[in-house]
Amino acid sequence: MTQPQKADEKPRFFRDEDESVINLNESRSLFVQDEADDSDDGQGHVESSSEVSSNTSNHKERFFESLKEILGENMISSSQLHTLWSSYGLLKDGISIAADKFFEDKELLSKSKTESKMPAGDNIEVIDLSDEENDDELSILPSSSQLSQLFTNKRTSTQAGLESPMSSDKGRNRWSRYIGSIHTMGFATRPTVKPVPIGSRLGFKKSVPKDLPLGKSLQHQHCSHLVRLIDTSQDRELGRMPEDVARILYPLLDYSEQVSLEPYLLINNGKRFSVGDNIYIRIDCYLTSQAFVRIEGGSILNKSFINDHGMDTRQLHRAGAIMALFDAINIQPVYGDTKNEMIPNYQENTVSSSQFQDEALNINQLKSFYRITQSAASLQNLPETTPDESLFKLQLRRYQKQSLSWMLKREYEYSHLSEKAAEVSIDGNSMNPLWKKFRWPSNSKQGTPNHEDDCFFYANLYTGEFSIEKPVIKTIINGGILADEMGLGKTISALALICTASYDEAHEKKIESTKKPSMKEMSSQVDSSPLRHSQHKHDTYAYRTTLIVVPMSLLNQWQSEFEKANKDLKKRCEIYYGNNIKDLRAYVLGPNAPSVIITTYGIIQSEYGRTSTSGLFNVVFFRIILDEGHTIRNRSTRTSKAVIALRSSRKWILTGTPIINRLDDLFSLVQFLNLEPWSHINYWKRYVSVPFEKGNYAQAFDVINAVLEPVLLRRTKNMKDVDGKPLVSLPPKEVIVEKLQLSSSEKRVYQSMLEDAENSVKEGLAKGDLLKNYTNILVHILRLRQVCCHLDLLKKTPDLGDPDLEDLENSTQNISSILMPKNIKSPKSSISQDKLDALSANFRDIHSASEQLPSFECAICTTECIEPLSAVSITECLHTFCEPCLAEYIEFQQNKKLSINCPYCRMPISEANVLKLKEPIDAERGYELISFHSHFQSTKIKALLRHLKQIQETSPGEQIIVFSQFSSFLDILEIELRSHLPRDQVIIYKFDGRLDMKERTRILEQFHDKDLSCIKLLLLSLKTGGVGLNLTCASRAFMMDPWWSPGMEDQAIDRIHRIGQQQTVKVVRFIIDNSVEEKMLRIQERKRMLGDIVEGDEAERRQKRIEEIQMLFQ
């Protein structure tokens, strides 16, 4: 026992910094003093027994009651009260000294806790954190074993009462269940006169204003001052909560009947709280019966807000707070075993390199998205349906039979399914994708509502709604998305569907039933019935016609495929150009309606908005199929709006790439399919676009997966069937990168262009306005790529449709001034016209005119009969050589810095003075020589010619594809190849976006016809050739220039390497060494590793492109 405190010492109750508070509140002292004490002499001596007056017993009672008020009745026992009275009861400020002593004496404090009224079995550990620095700790503390076990019994005792049915409300039992706890650290704002007991039940109160102004986002408000932590035993403020926790609590305090939040003091160091002290608390969270809604027939989805104002501000804040609460208590949704394995971890980056750490969502995660739909559809176990042989000519592969079953089910055409397939029906009541399934914590299992499955509950964290029953959404659309990888035969699958179910049988039966009505029906009033109305002259349902919408290049291919597949002569296919059928509406509603109408996206766009009553928009088709459906991905384009405005009872989308650049690419597909409510843009933005733009990829893709799971089917070439065999067996594919060296003249031009580009990038980086110079930089890169292809491209102003300039449409800069033609100087010949005439005369004398053209021999490779004659190079000494041989010899001598002499006679020659025969070449009229450099030949064209001549010698009859992105380069290639290859041995076709439909059809038909006597060469635009074409007749391809995205090139190659290909596919990619093209390959490899970037918005797309540009100049 310590000595009594001297009377003149200040009682230790508040910290020194709070003394001012005490002085200001002396009139409101917390301690009750006896009036007799005021006359005390201040020495603090103990009164003798002779001075004890008759009011001593009252003084003792006041002493006991004051200590109980300060310390709490449950914190101090009767024996302790008497001990403190006997030592300090008669001292001045004895109550204050006794309270100090109570907390300073460890033995007394321990004895107090042992004797206090606590539940049986409680074992409370006191953790002394008085000397720890906690200022930098996280506001929400991690749950350790020590924290989670602390006060377990106390929570259980409290919880037990809450789990029991609550007071009856209009005859209904009310209940609540524990879902988790938040461990957090608040801070004291008021001093306490005594320590708050560990495990004390605290409370929360909201400060005014109760609501934020309408439209205010809680994310931009400070909430810590709006939520007060209350000591319920004293009904006074104890402290405040950290900002992130307060932001959760603030909206939920208005909904305490639905979400119960119970704070308990978690840790105390045995001292009273002073201003600024840390307060460690645990907030136990409960859901009550009032939080749950009854879901009937998916009505909850109809209740969900479709526009931005469907929920008031309080509801929006509540929904956000509940989502944050579930994150804080770390309660996770429950998935099925398979699906749980397939859920991608969108936040985890599998690439260790630091330069890739800030990448946006990538194609690897898109593959995970596809895998989820594939897994959910149980692809390997899908039943098979074989089309009727009397209706369909072709033999389907196994996976195509499965897709036919799936498509028939999506249209609810069960009568056409095989017996086995018909046994498995489609579940039209899939779980609402906004809702998630959660498991009740195991320690709250008792006293649950009386349901079959009381282990789970369902929550819509986007709206803050809860349900005990599974919330479902009925999928009522007839159709879906067939997203098989390119080359797996989506066209054949769609044609099998058309031939199997070519018309609306149910509608036809209704029509038949109205043709011969009974007497009873005739006498009844049925004029307003749907059946009578369907026979009205204004009926627009073409129930026997499927409309197929395709890119123009595929128009005739689809018609040809239909003719190959269809075996029913009653079924017809028509192509609709817009003006070839005078009255489309009357045609498809008439008795001779075609089974299939094929048209293009362009025709639909041109008819959109017209007032005609006979076009596409005045008919409700039986079925609409969009081939290359990603064409409508941009919802703001006229084409997309037009296609979405088409009407039918069944809708299908065929695309190998549902997502191209943005997650919002899917919205137009969803809108076309009428997937309610996702087809409303505000709904889509709220649950998909906005979360994705904010970096919450998991949330956005979680919704997308759930939305598309029932309506999307995708298979890839690498997948295997139930027997472990690949879905398709394709021949090998070889892709070879051939690096080329620029010629000396090309190098000079390239280096000049490169310096300009680097200066522009460095200037932008130095000024910090690289994005402002975006247009300039793209043009510089375009010019560098053009140099790598052909110098003549620099003499032309590129069309803004070129791939590199597709992002410049909205530029405010004067693009024309940037793209001014460049003066590219070729090596200037020193031969005058008179000398040239003299050399021509001498050449004619050496090679006398005759009926047959002479055979020129190359003195380097000794090839006799150089063909064509346009490939003959002639020196000043009039010796002839192959153009590639002489060019290679001159370049070798220049690189070695050796003198250039004629390989035949050793006479000095000059690159600038090399000659060639002037075209047209006519031996009867005599030869005329011109300077070779009047027509420049690029390094890539030389390499291509070398390969083509080898193929010509070893594989006559080969069909070859030459890809390029630049239409102007295809023009140059056509001229060069025609002039250097014998016309009777090589046939050249050119296919790009400038051709009309008839020309495209003619070229493809002629190219497909194999001719063993000659090579057929198709010059193909990468953009045009990457869409839908079937080019399996060819097995060799050359890629003349690279593109940013490897996917674009892969799509083009897949036009060749697909079902129907019988030979090994060989692809050669020409890349200029140590150039911008070589660095583009690195970017492609980077994208293959990380995946093609899916950006949130246009600014992010541009920022990613700038990062790629910086890589080009590193």
From Swiss-Prot:
One of its GO terms (molecular function) is helicase activity. InterPro entries: Helicase_ATP-bd, Helicase_C-like, HIRAN, P-loop_NTPase, SNF2-like_sf, SNF2/RAD54-like_C, SNF2_N, SNF2_RAD54_helicase_TF. Keywords: ATP-binding, Cytoplasm, DNA damage, DNA repair, DNA-binding, Helicase, Hydrolase, Metal-binding, Nucleotide-binding, Nucleus, Zinc, Zinc-finger. A motif (DEGH box) lies at residues 627-630. SUPFAM superfamilies: P-loop containing nucleoside triphosphate hydrolases, RING/U-box. ATP binds at D484, E485, M486, G487, L488, G489, K490, T491. Its EC number is 3.6.4.-. A zinc finger (RING-type) spans 858-906. It is an enzyme of class 3 (hydrolase). GO terms for cellular component: cytoplasm; nucleus. It is found in: Cytoplasm; Nucleus. Residues 943-1114 form the Helicase C-terminal domain. GO terms for biological process: DNA repair. Residues 25-58 are annotated as: Disordered. It comes from the Eukaryota. Residues 471-676 form the Helicase ATP-binding domain. Residues 45-57 have a biased composition (Low complexity). Belongs to the SNF2/RAD54 helicase family. Probable helicase, member of the UBC2/RAD6 epistasis group. Functions with DNA repair protein RAD18 in error-free postreplication DNA repair. Involved in the maintenance of wild-type rates of instability of simple repetitive sequences such as poly(GT) repeats. Seems to be involved in maintaining a balance which acts in favor of error-prone non-homologous joining during DNA double-strand breaks repairs. This is DNA repair protein RAD5.
